[in-house]
């Protein structure tokens, strides 16, 4: 089973399925969805043992949040939503749960065959994005 430290590093997006549908379900407008679909971001995960930081970096936009596992915090998402978010590490996966305006979404990051697999779920819409480690 993976540990938080095994998720640490720079990861590059290599495959994406269902991202437009997920963004639509979250409430992202068409213009931002088109831009989001074109982006091939790097995901940079760092941890000092207590705090976790996730930075999503592309030529179009860079977003970052830091948190302590198990503690709720306010996150500003790439599309500008303000969410109440909590991250936990459960069964070898980093689970990020967001709530805003009576809605909720869960983003799970886990290792599969040496790749970072990110699964985003809202209602019955699921998006899977696969990243390969670059450093």
Curated annotation (Swiss-Prot):
One of its GO terms (cellular component) is cytosol. InterPro entries: Calycin, Fatty_acid-bd, ILBP, Lipocln_cytosolic_FA-bd_dom. Most abundant in lens and retina (found in the mueller cells), moderately abundant in heart and testis (found in the Sertoli cells), and present in very low amounts in lung. (9Z,12Z)-octadecadienoate binds at residues 129-131. The modification N-acetylalanine is found at residue 2. GO terms for biological process: fatty acid transport; glucose homeostasis; glucose metabolic process; lipid transport across blood-brain barrier; negative regulation of D-glucose transmembrane transport; phosphatidylcholine biosynthetic process; positive regulation of cold-induced thermogenesis; positive regulation of peroxisome proliferator activated receptor signaling pathway. N-eicosanoyl ethanolamine binds at residues 43, 109, 131. Pfam families: Lipocalin. GO terms for molecular function: fatty acid binding; identical protein binding; long-chain fatty acid transmembrane transporter activity; retinoic acid binding. Disulfide bonds join 120-127. PANTHER family: FATTY ACID BINDING PROTEIN. Intracellular carrier for long-chain fatty acids and related active lipids, such as endocannabinoids, that regulate the metabolism and actions of the ligands they bind. In addition to the cytosolic transport, selectively delivers specific fatty acids from the cytosol to the nucleus, wherein they activate nuclear receptors. Delivers retinoic acid to the nuclear receptor peroxisome proliferator-activated receptor delta; which promotes proliferation and survival. May also serve as a synaptic carrier of endocannabinoid at central synapses and thus controls retrograde endocannabinoid signaling. This is Fatty acid-binding protein 5.
């Amino acid at each position: 089973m993976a540990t938080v430290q095994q998720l640490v590093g720079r990861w590059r997006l290599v495959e994406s399925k269902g991202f437009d549908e997920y963004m639509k379900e979250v409430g992202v407008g068409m213009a931002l969805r088109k831009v989001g679909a074109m982006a091939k971001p790097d995901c940079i995960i760092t941890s000092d043992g207590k705090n976790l930081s996730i930075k999503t970096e592309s030529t179009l936009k860079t977003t970052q949040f830091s948190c302590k596992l198990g503690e709720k915090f306010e996150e500003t998402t790439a599309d500008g939503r303000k969410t109440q978010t909590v991250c936990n590490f459960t069964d070898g996966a980093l689970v990020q749960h967001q709530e805003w305006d009576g809605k909720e979404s869960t983003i799970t990051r886990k290792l599969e065959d040496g790749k970072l697999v990110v699964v985003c779920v809202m209602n019955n819409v699921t998006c899977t994005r696969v990243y390969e480690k670059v450093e």
